[in-house]
Each structure stands twice: as C-alpha cells, then as structure tokens.
Amino acid sequence: MVPQVLLFVPLLVFSMCFGKFPIYTIPDKLGPWSPIDIHHLSCPNNLVVEDEGCTNLSGFSYMELKVGYISAIKVNGFTCTGVVTEAETYTNFVGYVTTTFKRKHFRPTPDACRAAYNWKMAGDPRYEESLHNPYPDYHWLRTVKTTKESLVIISPSVADLDPYDKSLHSRVFPSGKCSGITISSTYCSTNHDYTIWMPENPRLGTSCDIFTNSRGKRASKGGKTCGFVDERGLYKSLKGACKLKLCGVLGLRLMDGTWVAMQTSDETKWCPPDQLVNLHDFRSDEIEHLVVEELVKKREECLDALESIMATKSVSFRRLSHLRKLVPGFGKAYTIFNKTLMEADAHYKSVRTWNEIIPSKGCLRVGGRCHPHVNGVFFNGIILGPDGHVLIPEMQSSLLQQHMELLESSVIPLMHPLADPSTVFKDGDEAEDFVEVHLPDVHKQISGVDLGLPSWGKYVLVSAGVLVVLMLTIFIMTCCGRVHRPKSTQHGLGGTGRKVSVTSQSGKVISSWESYKSGGETRL
C-alpha cells in the first residue's frame, strides 16, 4: 500500500472532470435573461455546491481516513513452530551411558500457540525451563527414549495489511499472501507445514487504525443527501459515488477519490474491484485549507464589489465577474446588455482547461455551442476584445488554480501492498533470532534388554551362543558316555550267566579278575 493518505479537496468534486480540479466554472445551462435592479445582485456561497436544490445544511459526523503519512498498514504477529525433541539413552553391560538428541517437527494448533505466546508476553518463568532439552533417563542394558513437544515462538513477524480485502502480505506466506484470517480461523499457513503465523492481537481489525471521526454539514433536500461540507469547509458531492469497504468498514468513494463513511438513504452501487481511493496527508490538508481561505477571500472580494456597486450605483464588467459561482451547481449569471443589468438562472460546470470554453478565436462555448454576444458582451465579465479574442478576467488570476494544481499533484492512490515490493520488503528486515519454547508433557519410553549391538551383531551373537551351547552339549554327552561304559561291560558279562574264577599262586581261589587285581596289588 503505498499509503500516503487521502485528502480530497474537491472543490469541484462532483463535476464530471473525473478527478481533475477545475480552474474555472461556466454555465452549461443558461436560462432566459431578465432585467433586474442592482439591489437584486448577490454573492454566491462558494463553500456549498447548490446542486439539485440541496441547500438544507445540518450538522453531522462522518468518518474519513486519518491525516498523516502511512507507508503501510503493519500487523505485528509471530510464528509458531512445533518441535519434538527426543533424548535417547543406552546403558551397556558395564554401566556406560550414551545419550543422543534428535529433533522432529509437528504442526501446532492455534490455541496452543496462542497460549504459548501469552506465556511469553506474561514473562512466565516456565519459559526458561522449557528451553532446555528433555532430561534423559536410563536403565541398565536398555534404551530409554524421552521426548518433549515444544512450541517455538519467533517474534516479531510483521505482515502488511491490504485495507481493501483485509488480506495479509509477507514472505512467510505461500505466494506471499494470506486471506484466511477470520473470526473462526485466526492463523495463516506458512511456507512450512509445521509453522503457522498468528497476529499478536486476535482482533485483526484493531491493526487497521486508519480512520478518524470528523464533523461537517450535510447538504440535503427532503430525505435525499446531495453532498456535505467537510471539516475543512469544502463541499463534496455524492454524485457518482460508489460503495467501497476499507478494513471491513463500509464507506463511499467519491468522484475525486475521497473515502468517507456516512449514513445515506440512497441506493449506491458497489465500486469495481480495481477501484482505489486516495490518501490523506498533511500537505494535502494544508492545501485544502489554503483553498478554503482563497474561497473566503473571493467571497470578501465579491462583497466588496457588491458594496462598491451599491455605493456608486454603477456596474462594470469587472465587478460582475466577482459574482460568478466558483464551484459547480446552481447559481446566477449576470451581464449588461444595452446599459441594462440582466440576470439569468444558470447551472455551472467545472472547466479543466481554457481550450474547453475557448476552442477558437471569438468563440465562447456554452452548452456545447458558441454563445452569442451582444455588442461584444457575454456574461460574468466575459467580453470580446478589440482583436476579436474572448477575454475572461479570471484568466489573469492564477492563485486559486495553482492551489488546485498543487492539491491534484498531492493526491496519491491507496494501493495494494505488493504494488511496489521495495516499500514492503527491505533488506535486513527479518525477524530477530530469539526463540521462546513452550514445552507440554514429557513422554518416556523404555525398551527391552538391549546389549547395544547393531542388528547384524545380534544375529552373530545368537549364532555364536547356539554354537557354544551345541559344543557344550556334545562335550557333556561325550564325558558321560565314557563314565558309564565300564558299568555297561560288567552288566553285559553278568548277563551270560557264567562266573569266572581263578586260583592264585597261594592256592586261594579268586572269584574275579578285579579281586585278583586288587589282591595282588595289596600284596605287592
């Protein structure tokens, strides 16, 4: 938004010059001339456009854009990122503990983010604690996982508000734009699925602080409002106005680009989608005051001329030029034909350039055609010079015209924020690198017995264990077989039913070989 503030000083606002300020007014409709006495002469009220007979003025209040330079409508916000911190510990056979930290992300909920932000703003001491990693627990020969879910708040994160559709513009949004802020949806998605953007103030409308209340006078006829006199004293017509919302506030965009919010009973059409309004700045406001002062000065000059006419009982073309209405609308036109003072009802329109009313030498265009003169005299002090050129007294006075040109040059449209990206995105305009964390519950998970080996190592260990068990089994079976073999032999011999006995050298009978062996050994 290239906001600079709208001030619309339309002295001839409602004229069909579409934003151009007039340098002169001339009748586009001129009634029949009738003779009058000098006492019927009067000075027009140039501060009110007496169009359509709306001469009833009543005080009222209206809302307009604030005066002051607005480079952009800034909305302070913050980003909220969901982070899961995982601490994994393993304790081996001898009690050695290994800890590994990992981080993952998750998409946070708006309510949790708002609560975390409120903690931060309130200076809750739990924030300092929540910045730490989860405290790791451990168990012998086991892997223990401890996790914490944290909400990382980064602020400030500033976005630009478009007053026309209340959309937000920032680099953090997908495609640079967010249109989802409503009463039911109070956040914007960002370029990351696990990060959302939220305004610091849940009521987004409070960020659009660009309006001010003013007092003026409503011009109406019956129940119809034709226009109003603004707080600075200038009349603004509602002819050609259309309805337009700014920051969700319904108002009227006038022909000169002014935006006002006021109650009217007339049915007004909506403005086209691409219709913009002008800004209101101090410079334009100052020029508008100068224009009002100039109009007041012109009225004083008119009263002086009228007083001179009454005192001298004489009228000149130059004095009659002071009685011309300076703003569009209904008024009077005066002239002198054959030494007779004449008056006619007229409806004045604005003129942008002198060529509009003097297209060629000797031609004064009124109502689309060259107006006839009477002995070189037109009206309102306009005469035909000796060289055949049309002479208008106001062509010699350009002060009011200069004010209007200055005013016109100061009117700047209230544009969309991305119309000039350089005014929105500046180098180094990034959020400060500080983080506040909101950590809810801590989750702990304990695994089964873990020897700390990789998956292939576990298979090797199991295979080796099986092999060792098999070898031990074979060894035990072998040993047991050797121990039981002699008993098996003895049992076999007894099974034959034969008994072997021998006689020793001493003549003693030995019943068996074992007895003999033991007896022999004993004697030995």
Curated annotation (Swiss-Prot):
Biotechnological exploitation: Primary surface antigen capable of inducing and reacting with virus-neutralizing antibodies. Almost all human and veterinary vaccines are based on the functional aspects of the G protein.
Alphabetically ordered keywords of this record: Disulfide bond, Glycoprotein, Lipoprotein, Membrane, Palmitate, Signal, Transmembrane, Transmembrane helix, Viral envelope protein, Virion
Membrane topology, from the record: Single-pass type I membrane protein
Purpose: Attaches the virus to host cellular receptor, inducing endocytosis of the virion by using different host proteins including TFRC, GRM2 and ITGB1. In the endosome, the acidic pH induces conformational changes in the glycoprotein trimer, which trigger fusion between virus and cell membrane. There is convincing in vitro evidence that the muscular form of the nicotinic acetylcholine receptor (nAChR), the neuronal cell adhesion molecule (NCAM), and the p75 neurotrophin receptor (p75NTR) bind glycoprotein and thereby facilitate rabies virus entry into cells.
Disulfide bonds: 43-302, 54-226, 80-113, 178-188, 208-247, 242-271, 363-370
Summary of subunit composition and partner proteins: Homotrimer. Interacts with matrix protein. Interacts with host TRFC. Interacts with host BST2; this interaction inhibits viral budding by tethering new virions to the cell surface. Interacts with ITGB1. Interacts with host GRM2.
Organism field: Rabies virus (strain India) (RABV)
Name by which UniProt lists this protein: Glycoprotein
Glycosylated residues, chain numbering: 56, 338
Family under the similarity heading: Belongs to the lyssavirus glycoprotein family.
Effect on the protein upon substituting residue 311 to T: In strain: Isolate Germany
Impact after mutating residue 481 to R: In strain: Isolate Germany
UniProt gene name: G
Extent of the signal sequence: 1-19
Residue ranges, Intravirion side: 481-524
